[in-house]
């Protein structure tokens, strides 16, 4: 039986996982998504064409690869159907777990209403209903994708839920659509999605028993993990490597190589602690050059320098074997670049990631910048200062950088 390799984001998401998954997936037979929902987004550039994926695994761009949405994902059928429409001939190469939970229209309404009520204490969620969908799952009142196969029964169950929760919906000023509209939507979802709904855990086990090569595609980033991230400014699922096991039905022994994706600088969407955020011209330049606007929301990302303390923390949580360093070309032309190698925290210098990160101040090491690396494909062709930056990251983290992205294009990647 083969083991599954895993790609996981090491920062606050948006590291560039999609490009690496797309590049590596041609070497695999199966690509799986294990958690999150359409709040996550991968942007992939192929031959000048931009693909924005939110639920469908990135392996979908390769027609000989099986793609699986696992039980740990919360699935918005409307979004999924829209995304599937971009691709031809999905039968036999795309599957959705019947155990995955549904993220329906009322979940988004709840999400947005609760954020409004929080005012300046808002988390900064995407408003896509992810938290409420996971809340229903954990409180054992959610509904699963497999229930779409009987839309009438699902509709009746939903109407009972809405009736029992009417005071809650009224308090949030949420108006539930009429029953006939809900049923019509559920029937439409079933008509499109039924051929793809199956027991994906068994499907995955059979593939691994047959020695098929499997790649697990992480969503978002480790520092957004519900347990290990910067709580409460986190997502509602486990984004660490262990979450891939529960989100697909795999044992920890099933995991092979873990590839950690790190961006050459740091970004964050929404609120929460961000020690290396740069509010000056460097931060603005990183945002503009890196086109740091959310794939899902279009929101401008907060930008700053690389935080090695957070990277080391995430790497231990995930058992990272090697890194892929993304968007190194965005640093082209900076006179100097910075790496945060420690924090000043409550009068001490620390090199660990505290639970109250808002009280940490970065301690920087400054390195000389470099000219353009755009499109370079050999490590020895990189400017000396770019190589020094890469090697300093390796020294500080103790992990080798095996992949280096030098442009958004799939083929502009150095493999070491």
UniProtKB/Swiss-Prot annotation:
Known catalytic reactions: IMP + L-aspartate + GTP = N(6)-(1,2-dicarboxyethyl)-AMP + GDP + phosphate + 2 H(+)
Residue sites binding substrate per the record: 295-301
Keywords from the named record: Cytoplasm, GTP-binding, Ligase, Magnesium, Metal-binding, Nucleotide-binding, Purine biosynthesis
Pathway annotation from the record: Purine metabolism; AMP biosynthesis via de novo pathway; AMP from IMP: step 1/2
Its EC number(s): 6.3.4.4
Positions that bind IMP: 14-17, 39-42, 126, 140, 220, 235, 299
Binding site for Mg(2+): 14, 41
Keyword Acyltransferase: no
Protein location: Cytoplasm
Cofactor field: Mg(2+)
GO terms under biological process: 'de novo' AMP biosynthetic process; IMP metabolic process
Binding site for GTP: 13-19, 41-43, 301, 327-329, 405-407
Comment on bound cofactor: Binds 1 Mg(2+) ion per subunit.
Pfam families linked: Adenylsucc_synt (PF00709)
Record family assignment: Belongs to the adenylosuccinate synthetase family.
Classification via NCBIfam families: PRK01117.1 (NF002223), purA (TIGR00184)
Protein name: Adenylosuccinate synthetase
Species assigned in the record: Campylobacter fetus subsp. fetus (strain 82-40)
Source lineage: Bacteria, Pseudomonadati, Campylobacterota, Epsilonproteobacteria, Campylobacterales
Gene for this chain: purA
